[in-house]
């Protein structure tokens, strides 16, 4: 009887030790599972943070591309406005040149009339000399000569009046011509300034076109980076899904281990109670 009890006690003790070992092992596995679960949760949080940074960077690249497109459109509008202004100034220059041609024609006409007046004055002067010579030679024709002299003076006065009128008109024409030339010079100066401005605008436009090409290359680069980031995003999402499944699996494993630990504790409690009963029985014997 004692031998059977001792053997049973040894078996109970061995079962107790095995139960303690399994309980300790279950607790160790539970701790490892919890640590692995926390590690996966940290990795998932890091991936989500990295994903948020990638989305912010993508928004920044999109905004930079939008600003570049707006600047290019503004440069094209300025170039178009400059070309329209140059065309308008070319038309104004053409009108000024036509007005200058008309002024030169009026000046040529005035000079011709002045030349005719000078010829008439010369002829009058020669007539006066002829009359004076005839007066010296023939006193009898004095009255006729005086009449001719008066006529000559009248012609001379008329010629002088015409000359003064022509001279006055010439001064006016010269003033008009001078003002026209000043306007033409001003127009030429303005045209030169506008040509220089157009040249600068053209250079700026070329620079903007180069920038646009550069922005286009950057856009291609950004698109490539976006594609890479999209692939990384998909990969991160896949890893996140896998991590979530792993966490769920580990949580289930932890639950199973906790259930097993609880069962082992119950079994240990039952063995302890059975061992206590056996010891009590031995004490009673």
From Swiss-Prot:
<feature type="modified residue" description="Phosphoserine">
    <location>
        <position position="272"/>
    </location>
</feature>
<dbReference type="GO" id="GO:0005829">
    <property type="term" value="C:cytosol"/>
</dbReference>
<keyword id="KW-0656">Proto-oncogene</keyword>
<feature type="modified residue" description="Phosphothreonine">
    <location>
        <position position="109"/>
    </location>
</feature>
<protein>
    <recommendedName>
        <fullName>Tropomyosin alpha-3 chain</fullName>
    </recommendedName>
</protein>
<comment type="similarity">
    <text>Belongs to the tropomyosin family.</text>
</comment>
<keyword id="KW-0009">Actin-binding</keyword>
<dbReference type="GO" id="GO:0005739">
    <property type="term" value="C:mitochondrion"/>
</dbReference>
<dbReference type="GO" id="GO:0001725">
    <property type="term" value="C:stress fiber"/>
</dbReference>
<comment type="function">
    <text>Binds to actin filaments in muscle and non-muscle cells. Plays a central role, in association with the troponin complex, in the calcium dependent regulation of vertebrate striated muscle contraction. Smooth muscle contraction is regulated by interaction with caldesmon. In non-muscle cells is implicated in stabilizing cytoskeleton actin filaments.</text>
</comment>
<feature type="modified residue" description="Phosphoserine">
    <location>
        <position position="88"/>
    </location>
</feature>
<keyword id="KW-0160">Chromosomal rearrangement</keyword>
<feature type="modified residue" description="Phosphoserine">
    <location>
        <position position="207"/>
    </location>
</feature>
<dbReference type="GO" id="GO:0007015">
    <property type="term" value="P:actin filament organization"/>
</dbReference>
<feature type="modified residue" description="Phosphothreonine">
    <location>
        <position position="54"/>
    </location>
</feature>
<keyword id="KW-0514">Muscle protein</keyword>
<dbReference type="GO" id="GO:0015629">
    <property type="term" value="C:actin cytoskeleton"/>
</dbReference>
<keyword id="KW-0175">Coiled coil</keyword>
<feature type="coiled-coil region">
    <location>
        <begin position="1"/>
        <end position="285"/>
    </location>
</feature>
<keyword id="KW-0963">Cytoplasm</keyword>
<feature type="modified residue" description="Phosphoserine">
    <location>
        <position position="216"/>
    </location>
</feature>
<feature type="compositionally biased region" description="Basic and acidic residues">
    <location>
        <begin position="16"/>
        <end position="41"/>
    </location>
</feature>
<dbReference type="GO" id="GO:0006936">
    <property type="term" value="P:muscle contraction"/>
</dbReference>
<dbReference type="GO" id="GO:0051015">
    <property type="term" value="F:actin filament binding"/>
</dbReference>
<feature type="modified residue" description="Phosphoserine">
    <location>
        <position position="62"/>
    </location>
</feature>
<keyword id="KW-1057">Nemaline myopathy</keyword>
<feature type="region of interest" description="Disordered">
    <location>
        <begin position="16"/>
        <end position="44"/>
    </location>
</feature>
<feature type="modified residue" description="Phosphothreonine">
    <location>
        <position position="253"/>
    </location>
</feature>
<comment type="subunit">
    <text>Homodimer. Heterodimer of an alpha (TPM1, TPM3 or TPM4) and a beta (TPM2) chain. Interacts with TMOD1. Interacts with TNNT1.</text>
</comment>
<dbReference type="GO" id="GO:0005862">
    <property type="term" value="C:muscle thin filament tropomyosin"/>
</dbReference>
<dbReference type="GO" id="GO:0005884">
    <property type="term" value="C:actin filament"/>
</dbReference>
<dbReference type="GO" id="GO:0005856">
    <property type="term" value="C:cytoskeleton"/>
</dbReference>
<dbReference type="GO" id="GO:0070062">
    <property type="term" value="C:extracellular exosome"/>
</dbReference>
<keyword id="KW-0007">Acetylation</keyword>
<feature type="modified residue" description="Phosphotyrosine">
    <location>
        <position position="262"/>
    </location>
</feature>
<feature type="modified residue" description="N-acetylmethionine">
    <location>
        <position position="2"/>
    </location>
</feature>
<keyword id="KW-0206">Cytoskeleton</keyword>
<dbReference type="InterPro" id="IPR000533">
    <property type="entry name" value="Tropomyosin"/>
</dbReference>
<feature type="modified residue" description="Phosphothreonine">
    <location>
        <position position="283"/>
    </location>
</feature>
<keyword id="KW-0225">Disease variant</keyword>
<feature type="modified residue" description="Phosphoserine">
    <location>
        <position position="284"/>
    </location>
</feature>
<keyword id="KW-0597">Phosphoprotein</keyword>
């Amino acid at each position: 009887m004692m031998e059977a009890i001792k053997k049973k006690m040894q078996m109970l003790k061995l079962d107790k030790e095995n139960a303690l070992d399994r309980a300790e092992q279950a607790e160790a596995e539970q701790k490892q599972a919890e640590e692995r679960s926390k590690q996966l949760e940290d990795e998932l949080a890091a991936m989500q943070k990295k994903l948020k940074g990638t989305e912010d960077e993508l928004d920044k690249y999109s905004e930079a591309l939008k600003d570049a497109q707006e600047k290019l459109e503004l440069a094209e509008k300025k170039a178009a406005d400059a070309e329209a202004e140059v065309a308008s100034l070319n038309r104004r220059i053409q009108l000024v040149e036509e007005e200058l041609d008309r002024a030169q024609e009026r000046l040529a006409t005035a000079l011709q009339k002045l030349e005719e007046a000078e010829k008439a004055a010369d002829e009058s002067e020669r007539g006066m000399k002829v009359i004076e010579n005839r007066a010296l030679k023939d006193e009898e024709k004095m009255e006729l000569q005086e009449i001719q002299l008066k006529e000559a003076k009248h012609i001379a006065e008329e010629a002088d009046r015409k000359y003064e009128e022509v001279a006055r008109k010439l001064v006016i024409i010269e003033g008009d011509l001078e003002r026209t030339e000043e306007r033409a010079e001003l127009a030429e100066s303005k045209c030169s300034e506008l040509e220089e401005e157009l040249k600068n605008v053209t250079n700026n436009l070329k620079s903007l076109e180069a920038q646009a090409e550069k922005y286009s290359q950057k856009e291609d680069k950004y698109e490539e980076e976006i594609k890479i980031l999209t692939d990384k995003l998909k990969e991160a999402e896949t890893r996140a899904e896998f991590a979530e499944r792993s966490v769920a699996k580990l949580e289930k494993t932890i639950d199973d281990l906790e259930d097993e630990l609880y069962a082992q504790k119950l079994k240990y409690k039952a063995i302890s109670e059975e061992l206590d009963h056996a010891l009590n029985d031995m004490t009673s014997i």
